[in-house]
Regions:
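Short, intrinsically disordered, charge-balanced linker/junction segments flanking boundaries
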Residues: 289, 518-527
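Residues in well-ordered beta-strands of folded domains
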Residues: 28, 38, 52, 69, ...
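Metal/cofactor-centered catalytic core regions of large enzymes
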Residues: 40-44, 384, 490, 501, ...
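Non-catalytic alpha/beta scaffold blocks inside enzyme catalytic domains
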Residues: 60, 144-327, 335, 345-348, ...
Length: 527
């Protein structure tokens, strides 16, 4: 499949590896470059076009600037790196990993993952095979505060029904500047049919420029603005009585607390004029329940401020007062998740789930323990609890807050291994650096899309063969490390074995799925 597009000019349906969105495109190789054909009719991730990031990613396989081309080992004097063989890399890394396990136990090992990465399945499996629970996603550097606030207020983070809303308010998020082309199109469609767009942002972003109302908030003070809006909704009796009476507990206590959140108080905190706060609250209420304060994403609402969790809870509060939860045009309930199949443990050796909690979970008990908090890695290193770290498709030395401090903390580890495509700040600070391949050079397996009434799966096909002989997909790297660590039996399966097991419950043929790029599961899922 990978060589088909490379050598005969035929198109291969795949998805972009630039972010979570998995925008679908049909790829072919033409004059030494990858050409993306869009849209892919019927594909659940169909997009009109790729965004700037997605277009840039098409050239990455051919761009050797800062590309890691061989396994590298830091010189003993720290003066640079030397290329080594994969066998040497696996053996030497395994020796040091097992040494840490023998001395401190498996909980002294950790891994932090970037996104997106299909090979995270192998990453988790590798750490679990060694007995370590410490696998951390990127949420802790992106949006864990927001997610925690929503999960402890509503149980989930809802999606805004932009297609049907009459009024939507965004905080700390600019769809125009940073989202998929599909999201930009949806926003323009909403404007075209008369929906009101309210943008809360300190600067005049692309979305603020086209908004009906731009609220120029003091950075980090969105919470005060939301509380001021809640005050108006309660004091002017603009909230949804039926929704509150049926679904809400503690409203009397809320009403009492809200009496202090006057628009004038909010103005003193967030710099948005009191009159604008009142007008915004009334505009949202007039459109409710087809009105919504968007749940947010990264940035200031995601994690950037000490009050980001409380800000997410305040967004939930306003949406509840509007009665828009689960309502068309409001904040949609999540659909029932689609559970993929898994490898048969009677055929494939499967590591046990570690019983101990992730390091850091005791300090932040509200954070989902399965998700973890990657930013606690530094605290665990400083305390001496974490001695070995694998960094996969991530860059704490630049992507986490206070990057210089992170680089200093990482130097305290007994072992630091980076697996990535290009040299990064973290890679340059590592003991070993292992070269990954770009997303176009390897199959990335099965993904899912669950809509309001149905569920589909799609396949992320490779477009190119591996262009540099000494680079390897993440799954092969973890399998090699596992074999060197004596747990290779847990990796005696292929990418196709896993993908076939994942779609088997739906009666989907893997070869047909790869050829078409997507398939219906035949399941009707209630929301």
């Amino acid at each position: 499949m990978a060589s088909r597009a490379m050598h005969d000019g035929r198109s291969v349906v795949t998805t972009c590896g630039g972010c979570y969105a998995d925008c679908a495109f049909a790829a072919r190789v033409e004059d030494g470059r990858v050409v993306a054909e869009l849209p892919v009719p019927g594909h659940p991730c169909a997009a009109r076009a790729l965004c700037a990031r997605g277009r840039h990613r098409l050239a990455m396989p051919f761009d050797e600037r800062d590309r890691i081309l061989h396994p590298m080992r830091r010189r003993w004097d720290g003066s640079g790196f030397d290329a080594i063989t994969w066998d040497e890399a696996f053996a030497q890394i395994a020796e040091r990993l097992l040494g840490i396990v023998d001395e401190r136990g498996p909980r002294a090992l950790g891994m932090t993952l970037g996104v997106p990465s299909f090979d995270r399945y192998w990453a988790y499996r590798f750490m679990h095979a060694l007995g370590s629970p410490n696998v951390y996603g990127a949420d802790g550097a992106c949006e864990v505060s927001r997610l925690t606030g929503w999960e402890h207020s509503l149980g989930y983070s809802p999606a805004s029904d932009l297609a049907h809303t009459d009024c939507i308010m965004y905080l700390g998020r600019s769809i125009v500047d940073s989202s998929t082309m599909g999201a930009v199109d949806a926003l323009n469609d909403a404007r075209g049919r008369g929906a009101k767009i309210i943008v809360v942002a300190p600067r005049r972003s692309g979305s603020a420029a086209l908004a009906d109302r731009w609220l120029r908030v003091r950075p980090g003070c969105d919470l005060a603005l939301l509380l001021g809006i809640a005050h108006v909704l309660v004091s002017e009796d603009l909230y949804d009585h039926e929704f509150v009476d049926r679904y809400v507990t503690g409203f009397d206590e809320l009403a009492q607390a809200a009496s202090a959140w006057t628009p004038e108080w909010a103005e003193s905190m967030c710099d948005v004029p009191a009159a604008e706060i009142v007008a915004t609250a009334r505009e949202l209420a007039a459109a409710a329940p087809a009105a919504v304060v968007d749940a947010g994403f990264h940035g200031g609402i995601g994690i950037a401020y000490a009050n980001s969790t409380q800000t997410a809870r305040a967004i939930c509060l306003v949406d509840v007062l509007l009665g828009c939860i689960g309502h068309e045009g409001g904040a949609l309930n999540p659909p029932t998740p689609l559970v993929l199949g898994d490898l048969d443990p009677t055929r494939f050796a499967t590591p046990s789930m570690p019983r101990e909690p992730k390091l850091g979970s005791e300090r932040y008990p509200l954070v989902d323990p399965m998700r973890g908090l990657c930013t606690t890695i530094g605290q665990s290193i400083f305390a001496g609890d974490l001695r070995g770290l694998i960094v996969y498709a991530s860059n704490p030395g630049a992507g986490y807050g206070n990057a210089q401090a992170w680089l200093g903390i990482l130097q305290q580890l007994d072992l630091l291994v980076t697996i990535d495509i290009r040299w990064s700040e973290t890679a340059r600070a590592s003991d070993f650096v292992l070269p990954d391949v770009t997303y176009l050079e390897a199959d990335r397996g099965v993904g899912t899309v669950v809509g309001a009434n149905d569920a589909r799966v799609f396949y992320r096909n490779a477009v190119l063969p591996i262009l540099h002989d000494d680079t390897r997909p993440g799954r092969e790297i973890f399998a090699g490390l596992a074999a060197a660590c004596g747990v290779g039996e847990c990796f005696d399966f292929t990418c196709d074995d896993l993908a076939a097991a994942q779609v088997a419950p739906f009666g989907i043929d893997l070869a047909a799925l790869k050829e078409r790029g997507w398939a219906d599961t035949g399941m009707a899922l209630p929301t």
